[in-house]
Amino acid sequence: VKVTAFAVKHGSWKEALGYRFDADGKSIVISGDTRPVDSVVEACNGCDMLVHEVYSGTPTNAEDAAYFSSFHTSAEQLGEIAAKAKPKLLVVWHYVPLRDTNEAKMVEAIHQTFHGAIVVANDLDVISP
Protein backbone atom coordinates (compact mmCIF):
# COMPACT_ATOMS: atom_id res chain seq x y z
CA VAL A 1 0.00 0.00 0.00
CA LYS A 2 1.29 3.43 -0.93
CA VAL A 3 -0.07 6.31 1.18
CA THR A 4 0.37 9.91 0.05
CA ALA A 5 -0.60 12.84 2.28
CA PHE A 6 -1.51 16.23 0.85
CA ALA A 7 -2.40 19.58 2.39
CA VAL A 8 -6.02 20.75 2.64
CA LYS A 9 -7.54 23.85 4.26
CA HIS A 10 -9.66 23.54 7.39
CA GLY A 11 -10.40 27.03 8.62
CA SER A 12 -7.81 28.42 11.00
CA TRP A 13 -6.00 25.10 11.50
CA LYS A 14 -2.34 25.41 10.59
CA GLU A 15 -2.20 21.85 9.30
CA ALA A 16 -4.90 19.65 7.83
CA LEU A 17 -4.35 16.68 5.55
CA GLY A 18 -6.08 14.53 2.99
CA TYR A 19 -4.77 11.14 1.90
CA ARG A 20 -4.47 9.03 -1.22
CA PHE A 21 -4.17 5.26 -0.86
CA ASP A 22 -2.91 3.16 -3.79
CA ALA A 23 -2.93 -0.64 -3.69
CA ASP A 24 -3.49 -3.49 -6.13
CA GLY A 25 -4.27 -1.13 -9.00
CA LYS A 26 -6.98 0.75 -7.07
CA SER A 27 -6.88 4.20 -5.50
CA ILE A 28 -8.91 5.94 -2.83
CA VAL A 29 -8.64 9.64 -1.95
CA ILE A 30 -9.94 10.88 1.41
CA SER A 31 -10.40 14.63 1.67
CA GLY A 32 -10.39 14.98 5.43
CA ASP A 33 -12.22 18.05 6.75
CA THR A 34 -11.64 20.79 4.19
CA ARG A 35 -13.02 23.74 2.35
CA PRO A 36 -12.67 23.47 -1.46
CA VAL A 37 -9.00 23.15 -2.46
CA ASP A 38 -7.25 22.22 -5.70
CA SER A 39 -5.07 19.67 -3.90
CA VAL A 40 -8.04 17.28 -3.65
CA VAL A 41 -8.59 17.45 -7.41
CA GLU A 42 -4.87 16.95 -8.04
CA ALA A 43 -4.73 13.95 -5.67
CA CYS A 44 -7.66 12.32 -7.46
CA ASN A 45 -5.80 11.96 -10.75
CA GLY A 46 -7.26 8.68 -12.01
CA CYS A 47 -8.71 7.68 -8.63
CA ASP A 48 -11.34 5.00 -8.23
CA MET A 49 -13.00 6.56 -5.19
CA LEU A 50 -13.14 10.02 -3.66
CA VAL A 51 -14.36 10.12 -0.06
CA HIS A 52 -15.25 13.73 0.72
CA GLU A 53 -16.99 15.59 3.54
CA VAL A 54 -19.92 17.91 2.79
CA TYR A 55 -22.54 20.21 4.22
CA SER A 56 -25.74 21.21 2.51
CA GLY A 57 -28.43 23.78 3.08
CA THR A 58 -28.31 27.36 4.23
CA PRO A 59 -26.54 28.43 7.43
CA THR A 60 -28.88 30.15 9.88
CA ASN A 61 -26.76 33.26 10.42
CA ALA A 62 -23.65 35.11 9.21
CA GLU A 63 -21.42 33.53 11.86
CA ASP A 64 -22.41 30.01 10.80
CA ALA A 65 -22.02 30.94 7.12
CA ALA A 66 -18.47 32.17 7.77
CA TYR A 67 -17.63 29.01 9.73
CA PHE A 68 -18.94 26.57 7.15
CA SER A 69 -17.36 28.36 4.18
CA SER A 70 -13.98 28.43 5.94
CA PHE A 71 -13.96 24.91 7.39
CA HIS A 72 -16.11 22.74 5.09
CA THR A 73 -17.32 22.11 1.52
CA SER A 74 -20.89 22.74 0.37
CA ALA A 75 -22.77 20.24 -1.77
CA GLU A 76 -22.59 22.60 -4.75
CA GLN A 77 -18.84 23.05 -4.29
CA LEU A 78 -18.36 19.29 -3.94
CA GLY A 79 -20.16 18.78 -7.24
CA GLU A 80 -17.67 21.13 -8.90
CA ILE A 81 -14.70 19.38 -7.24
CA ALA A 82 -15.93 15.93 -8.27
CA ALA A 83 -16.63 17.11 -11.84
CA LYS A 84 -12.98 18.21 -12.11
CA ALA A 85 -11.55 15.21 -10.21
CA LYS A 86 -13.61 12.60 -12.11
CA PRO A 87 -13.58 9.79 -9.51
CA LYS A 88 -15.27 6.58 -10.57
CA LEU A 89 -17.25 6.77 -7.31
CA LEU A 90 -17.91 9.72 -4.99
CA VAL A 91 -18.53 8.74 -1.37
CA VAL A 92 -20.02 11.49 0.77
CA TRP A 93 -19.26 11.36 4.51
CA HIS A 94 -19.26 13.66 7.52
CA TYR A 95 -22.51 15.05 6.12
CA VAL A 96 -23.85 18.10 7.93
CA PRO A 97 -27.46 18.83 6.95
CA LEU A 98 -28.49 22.40 7.73
CA ARG A 99 -32.01 23.69 8.34
CA ASP A 100 -33.52 23.62 4.86
CA THR A 101 -32.17 20.43 3.33
CA ASN A 102 -32.12 16.66 3.41
CA GLU A 103 -30.03 13.88 1.89
CA ALA A 104 -31.92 13.86 -1.41
CA LYS A 105 -31.48 17.62 -1.87
CA MET A 106 -27.79 17.29 -1.06
CA VAL A 107 -27.28 14.60 -3.72
CA GLU A 108 -29.31 16.69 -6.19
CA ALA A 109 -27.06 19.70 -5.53
CA ILE A 110 -23.93 17.61 -6.17
CA HIS A 111 -25.44 16.17 -9.36
CA GLN A 112 -25.91 19.67 -10.80
CA THR A 113 -22.27 19.49 -11.93
CA PHE A 114 -21.07 15.94 -11.15
CA HIS A 115 -22.88 13.24 -13.09
CA GLY A 116 -21.10 10.19 -11.69
CA ALA A 117 -22.07 7.66 -9.05
CA ILE A 118 -22.58 8.90 -5.47
CA VAL A 119 -22.86 6.90 -2.25
CA VAL A 120 -23.89 8.64 0.97
CA ALA A 121 -21.92 6.78 3.64
CA ASN A 122 -23.03 6.03 7.17
CA ASP A 123 -20.89 5.02 10.12
CA LEU A 124 -19.60 1.44 9.77
CA ASP A 125 -20.45 1.18 6.05
CA VAL A 126 -18.02 -0.90 3.97
CA ILE A 127 -17.59 0.42 0.43
CA SER A 128 -15.15 -1.03 -2.11
CA PRO A 129 -13.74 0.82 -5.12
Q: What is each model feature region?
A:
Residues V1-V3, A23-I28:
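Beta-strand-turn-beta hairpins that frame and shape the catalytic cleft
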Residues T4, I30, V91:
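Conserved Rossmann-like nucleotide-binding pocket used by diverse enzymes
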Residues R20-F21, P129:
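Conserved hydrophobic "DFG−1" position in protein kinase catalytic cores
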Residues G11, D125-P129:
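A short acidic, often aromatic-flanked loop/helix-cap motif at beta-alpha or helix-coil junctions
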Residues A7-K9, G32-T34, D38:
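Short, well-ordered turn and helix-capping elements at secondary-structure junctions
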Residues V1-E15, V119:
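Metallo-beta-lactamase
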Residues G18, G25-S27, R35-D125:
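Cap/insert and terminal regions of metallo-dependent hydrolase folds
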